[in-house]
Amino acid sequence: MTPALAAGLQVVFVLAVLAVAYVPVGDYMARVYESRRHLRVESVLYRLCRIDPHAEQTWYGYAGSVLGFSAASVLFLYALQRIQGVLPLSGDLSGVSPAVAFNTAVSFVTNTNWQSYAPETTMSNLTQPVGLAVQNFVSAAVGMAVAVALIRGFVRVSRGGEIGNFWVDLTRGSLRILLPFSFVIALILLSQGVIQSFHPGFASTGLDGNSVTNALAPVASQEAIKELGTNGGGILAANSAHPFENPTPVSNIVEILAILLIPVSLTRTFGTMVGERKQGLTLLAVMGILWGSLLAVTLAAESGRRGVAATAAGAMMEGKEVRFGIPGTALFAVSTTGTSTGAVNSAHDSLSPLGGGAVLLNMLLGEIAPGGVGTGLYGILVLALIAVFVGGLLVGRTPEYLGKKLRQREITLAALSVLVMPALVLIGTGITVILSSTTGYQGNSGDPGSPGSIHGFSEVLYAFASASNNNGSAFGGLTVTSDWFQTALGLCMLFGRFLPIIFVLALAGSLASQKKTAAGTGTLPTAGPMFTGLLTGTVVLVAALTFFPALALGPIAEALQ
């Protein structure tokens, strides 16, 4: 079988499974969030927490609940890491240092899962499931809740601007969607050889004759939600390149499907809830065009034979697992950076300049191809409003989307939401590269314009793009254990997560308080090929105008050498 045929078959299989799951999963999630019935276990939780599940919240009440819950989660996870040495199942591990504990707590609560530590030698078998795995569920559920709140903003007509109840949305997303889906995925991964154990580990002798300690952990259960919730943080440092996490080509495809399942299906949920399923298909088409284009670029770049080693191997195999090959590696890399997952089955730092630039651009587009769980949907909806506004200017009409007028307030909130990530990425990268104290942490450096300095800049740009987009993947040549990186990247994760959430919820409240207007002859149609092209162009144009200078100094310059 030729590499091209292998790549084509894997892509076709992934798309076929997603197509089969699209309608049932999307409609199921719509029923979950629209249902008036509460499961018995949900009712018990509401009573224990003194929550009125029938009480509606305005946007600021909803935002306050999101921020309060997330702040409590950060404090709990930070404390758990600091005292893990005196807790059961800690083995020989001590408490985590303050800087790493802060960075990790912020990372997992924001759905970033940036890991500046070796998990198997830092986190205990209690901290992993009780602290980190729990956040894998609830941080994903928070993103889905915000997306659903924005959908309600388009659907509802309420003078008070109520957009739902955060606590109900959080509970339903966790118990009715993420938990059962994760259980099924975990069983499939177990069948492929992914480990599930609370044993501290075992010793073995390597080929060089030295003794090696192999860490064991409850991997399968966390691996499932790691991918399904677009979290990405692995129990093992090698992440999904490790055979304990991702042992076979079949498990690799299962993990890719888990990454894409909910973000793709949420477009169907959106179309179902607003009563116009073509609207969801239009958003899905934009996501598919961007995802497919970057996948083609990455496959072509990594299948090339640049250099003696690549020519001998038949492709750019450095940093890649032979059991996955170029197709499985490229498919995973584009899927994990097009969502907020950040899991890796290869060393992204070893990707070719063009391939590394493609996965970096995937994040800089705003992670909307197809985006993280919930975050991808509300991210592309915000960009859709920008596209409608631009289209309205072209035809001289008041912009409308789904019967709601886009006034100055709505456009301002949409623009602010879009601008948060670029500001964090460019400011963080700029400050880092001019600080002399950070150069020692760059594995690649040198005189200005040299290959080392160019790739070193790409590593810094990638780190801040990953943190600000709540992705979590990294170019491994950059050492991020210093207090500067722990703090700066931690702040980027916080602001990159919660500022857009605040703006999106404010937008949802503003839309919900409006009356619906009937579409007229001058209304821009927002379903179909024309709007698909307009929205795709808007996404690319915003990213190009914002990041082209930075990309020209990094991946583009490196590719041209």
Curated annotation (Swiss-Prot):
Main location: membrane
Listed transmembrane segments: 5-25, 60-80, 86-106, 131-151, 177-197, 247-267, 281-301, 324-344, 376-396, 415-435, 488-508, 537-557
Gene Ontology CC: one annotated term: plasma membrane
Localization in the cell: Cell membrane
InterPro entries with a match to the protein in the record: KdpA
Topology term for the membrane: Multi-pass membrane protein
Gene Ontology MF: a single term: potassium ion binding
Keywords for this protein: Cell membrane, Ion transport, Membrane, Potassium, Potassium transport, Transmembrane, Transmembrane helix, Transport
Domain of life: Bacteria
Job description of the protein: Part of the high-affinity ATP-driven potassium transport (or Kdp) system, which catalyzes the hydrolysis of ATP coupled with the electrogenic transport of potassium into the cytoplasm. This subunit binds the extracellular potassium ions and delivers the ions to the membrane domain of KdpB through an intramembrane tunnel.
Subunit text: The system is composed of three essential subunits: KdpA, KdpB and KdpC.
Family named by the database record: Belongs to the KdpA family.
Full protein name: Potassium-transporting ATPase potassium-binding subunit
Organism: Rhodococcus opacus (strain B4)
Phylogenetic placement of the source organism: Bacteria, Bacillati, Actinomycetota, Actinomycetes, Mycobacteriales
